[in-house]
Regions:
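Structural signature for solvent-exposed beta-strand/loop edge elements and short helix-capping sites
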Residues: 1-167
């Protein structure tokens, strides 16, 4: 049979120097998977991920967030929002897909269909249909890397930019 352990509020787990906190968790001891439900939070170093629910595959170091809003906030208050985000707790790398939006500490907004965030290097990579909005500039590109430490953006090929003082 399957051996489950139920942990209720607030449930706390520690793995790879990462805390998993939630209201309720079901731990499948046989497969070493944790199903976290309601007010789910992952805390690693100074990166915080929040969402409605996740499945944590302990042996693969992988947290799969799914829900209406999944949010990643780094120590510099750059905020990435999506509905689908996978986070590797060993490598400290997030992968988002099916659309995402990042707002940096200065208010710039970057959107794309998919991308990654490496919390060790503070590098966001945006892939496919990338749009960047500032108070006066709009940039559209196929890919973009954004270094959160230096606030430097590097665009891929097929990049177009517009400037308007009234944006």
């Amino acid at each position: 049979g399957v051996d489950y352990r139920k942990v209720t509020g607030p449930a706390r787990f520690l793995h790879n120097d990462t805390y998993l906190i939630c209201d309720t968790a079901l731990w499948n001891v046989n497969t070493n998977e944790i199903f976290a439900i309601s007010n789910v939070k992952i805390l690693q170093d100074q990166t915080v991920l929040t969402g409605d629910r996740l499945t944590y595959y302990v042996d693969r170091d992988l947290a799969e967030f799914r829900g209406s809003l999944v949010q990643l906030e780094d120590k510099d208050h750059n905020i990435l929002r999506t509905e689908y985000l996978d986070y590797n707790t060993r490598d400290s790398v997030a992968v988002f897909f099916n659309g995402g939006s990042m707002k940096d500490k200065e208010g710039q907004i970057i959107e794309s269909k998919s991308g990654t965030y490496d919390s060790k290097t503070k590098l966001f990579t945006f892939i496919d249909d990338v749009n960047m909005f500032t108070d006066s500039i709009f940039v559209k590109s196929t890919t973009m890397e954004y270094n959160a430490s230096t606030n430097k953006a590097t665009f891929g090929y097929a990049t177009d930019a517009w400037h308007d003082d009234n944006m």
